Amino acid sequence: MILDKHIVVVTGASRGIGRSIAVELARQGATVIGTATSESGAEGISEALKEFGGQSRGAVLNVTDAAASEAFIDGVVKEFGGLNVLVNNAGITKDQLAMRMKDDEFDAVIDTNLRAVFRLSRAVLRPMMKARGGRIINITSVVASSGNPGQANYAAAKAGVAGMTRALAREIGSRGITVNCIAPGFIDTDMTRALNEQQIAGLLQQIPLGRFGLPEDIAAAVGFLASSHASYITGTTIHVNGGMYMS
């Protein structure tokens, strides 16, 4: 299998895109530790990964807790002897028009969607450098490039992740570590299912392919970047959005 003997951490893996990423990487042979914020979420991840055997499982982690994040990565490295792939997928939204957005709504999104990505990436650098190889894959968003009303906090965080990705790629490329982004467009998840028919119709008009993407579309792109097929790709963003945004 492509990712046989690979140790992978996927944050925010209890549902949606994160769940599909964890399942896809396990299907490719990796040992996957997927994180959730609750015990029930972690148990759901373990159940989803059970069919692939091995030691793949769910784990509880609050990515905004700096000490817990560092301890979690240290624990994975000690248990398995290393860490090959980190997928920073965990994220939240607190949408609000800018003139009404409170500081705590802005800060919460930055803390989860940007600061936590930096902390976890920093935590994996030492073991990856020691192994002289690794993959850091960050899930950003189409709105980091296109913008979106009511999402100044979310767009700022995701654009920050894209910039940080490029900086890290230049910083650690000589150690054999690649750092890339996947930028999903509108994906068929709980969030898009909550939209009304008028909102859905308006969004579909902006997408040349005429449909929302599937979580599996994002998982396939992550699987590619995690594999040896992407060994010469770093510092880039792969847009998976049906043509909604083109660069």
Regions found by a protein language model. Give the residues of each.
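Conserved glycine-rich cofactor-binding loop
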Residues: I7, S14-R15
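Conserved glycine-rich Rossmann-like NAD(P)H-binding loop of the short-chain dehydrogenase/reductase
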Residues: Q28-G44
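Substrate-binding pocket helix/loop in short-chain dehydrogenase/reductase
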Residues: L97-A98, K102-I110, T192, L203
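Active-site helix of classical SDR
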Residues: S121, A157, T165
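Alpha-helical segment proximal to the catalytic Tyr-Lys
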Residues: R126, R170-S174, S231
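Residue(s) in the substrate-gating loop at a strand-loop-helix junction
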Residues: S141
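Short, small/polar-rich loop/turn modules that mediate ligand/substrate recognition or access, typified
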Residues: G173, T178, I233-G235, N241
